[in-house]
Amino acid sequence: MAPKKKTIKKNKAEINEMTIIVEDSPLSKLNALNGLLEGSNSLSCVSSELTDTSYGPNLLEGLSKMRQESFLCDLVIGTKTKSFDVHKSVMASCSEYFYNILKNDPSTKRVDLNDIAPLGLATVIAYAYTGKLTLSLYTIGSIISAAVYLQIHTLVKMCSDFLIREISVENCMYVVNIAETYSLKNAKATAQKFIRDNFIEFAESEQFMKLTFEQINELLVDDDLQLPSELVAFQIAMKWLEFDQKRVKHAADLLSNIRFGTISAQDLVNYVQTVPRMMQDADCHKLLVDAMNYHLLPYHQNTLQSRRTRIRGGCRVLITVGGRPGLTEKSLSRDILYRDPENGWSKLTEMPAKSFNQCVAVMDGFLYVAGGEDQNDARNQAKHAVSNFCRYDPRFNTWIHLGSMNQKRTHFSLSVFNGLLYAVGGRNSEGSLASLECYVPSTNQWQPKAPLEVARCCHASAVADGRVIVTGGYIGSAYSRSVCAYDPALDAWQELPQLSTPRGWHCAVALGDRLYVMGGSQLGPRGERVDVLTVESFSPAARQWSFVAPLPVGVSTAGVSALHGRAYLLGGWNEGDKKYKKCIQCFNPELNEWTEDDELPEATVGVSCCTLAMPNSVSRESRASSVSSVPVSI
């Protein structure tokens, strides 16, 4: 037998020593350290917040390891073929679906999701524990289905962003379909825009031929569909119809979306009328007849305007018309320029004749040019006033001469209201004019209306509150502050509150519910012409004028137009420098500030400006060569 071990008894001193060690706890140590701070003024006690950037990933890694080991798992999620052990707290923290279930019954041990695919659920659970997932177009369907059902919004957004990044001609319609199924508005809108912008390439893909009638119909209705010409849209529609004879029943409904009025008469005869379906189907034939009548009745086109006569895929751009360029003072310009948002100023076309101080207006998609002067004679401008009136069609790059004004006019104003044009005042060789005449497109005639109370020229007008408001100008032998309004419904004039500053050769433009008057000149203290820099704004509702930000550069006989809620003031004459100007000044009413935009190609006075809806650059370049060489028949 082994000898017994001898027990060593501890004396009282040793016991007391052990007690001292135990009492030296973390709290005691803390108190001891805090005591060192008391009475010390040299130590900084400013607190700082620190973040352990690895804490979150480490926590997720730990939770994921616990799930793999089924350690402390307290919930089972089941599908028809597979079950998963998870932690309630993890699933409830990222899924509104689980949060609501467990909040309602915290004792829940199992949740069965028989409508969710095991692959989708497994991916969702992995995401909940790691914040990571692997996506492909082959698996995203089951994943996004589970994410939407379980209301995991961050995962839904990741799937939506993935779809947007993956959009291509081959899969764009699949993206539209899946986005529509799960209400992914951003992904759907992005995919639809991709299809609109790449419609020609998309029409050559296999997906295009699989479109339902509703899907292709929605595309052909779209105003923003990018095409080289509407004839191509017709040929693409026929291609879809011809693919399956069962689709013939949709021919009239589908082709009603083609803007036949924007196809030239020659192309209608050569490439549309030759398609048997367009002659055999009564409804399709009517579409063709309506388009031909539209072309045969140019003076009635305003009243015949419809969705099928409007261009698609275009944009609204600034247009300049005529004027007197500074580098060739003795020569007037026939040029019409447009400002491309990407490429700057380019020549669009030429007017039938040179002019400046003419007036322009846009109505029903057409550009109208009226009056002005056909010769450069600074000493007697009124002598060369003309009554010419013509219309430009941007769809076909064509001009037609319209009925001349009843009186020759220069330094007048031209306004559009309710489908009619109103020419106000001005002057000619007989002097200043008080007359007002109205152009009626359906009759191609000008009708006299109630005249101004007093003759005036060099004024500016714009339409606001349903009336043509005429501001300032030259009355008698003086600049005027007078403001009056013409009511077309009453054929009557009414005086309005006057401008604060007299001015002439200025501009007026309507932005929102207000009228803005800018630029022009007046007489200085020594009788000399001086620039008017103040800009005034009129509220028809309050019948009150107020000042807004002044012009950076004073100009007279400039052009003005509104675009995207801003006013653009182009070119003109500066009295201070005695120079023609090429500057473009932009006014933002929301910020009440002027900025200098780009410049005109050449300093110009007597230039007119407007905003016109133009076909996209592709269509402008290829309208004459956009006809497909592949015949279609159905």
Curated annotation (Swiss-Prot):
Pfam families: BACK (PF07707), BTB (PF00651), Kelch_1 (PF01344), Kelch_KLHDC2_KLHL20_DRC7 (PF24681). InterPro entries: BACK, BTB-kelch_protein, BTB/POZ_dom, BTB_POZ_KLHL31, Kelch-typ_b-propeller, Kelch_1, SKP1/BTB/POZ_sf. Kelch repeats lie at residues 317-365, 366-419, 420-466, 468-513, 515-565, 566-614. Residues 172-273 form the BACK domain. Transmembrane segments: none annotated. GO terms for cellular component: cytoplasm; nucleus. The modification N,N,N-trimethylalanine is found at residue 2. N-terminus is methylated by METTL11A/NTM1. The keyword NAD does not apply. The keyword Nucleotide-binding does not apply. Keywords: Kelch repeat, Methylation, Repeat, Repressor, Transcription, Transcription regulation. Residues 73-137 form the BTB domain. PROSITE patterns: BTB (PS50097). GO terms for biological process: negative regulation of JNK cascade; negative regulation of protein phosphorylation. Transcriptional repressor in MAPK/JNK signaling pathway to regulate cellular functions. Overexpression inhibits the transcriptional activities of both the TPA-response element (TRE) and serum response element (SRE). This is Kelch-like protein 31. It comes from Mus musculus (Mouse). The lineage of its organism: Eukaryota, Metazoa, Chordata, Craniata, Vertebrata.
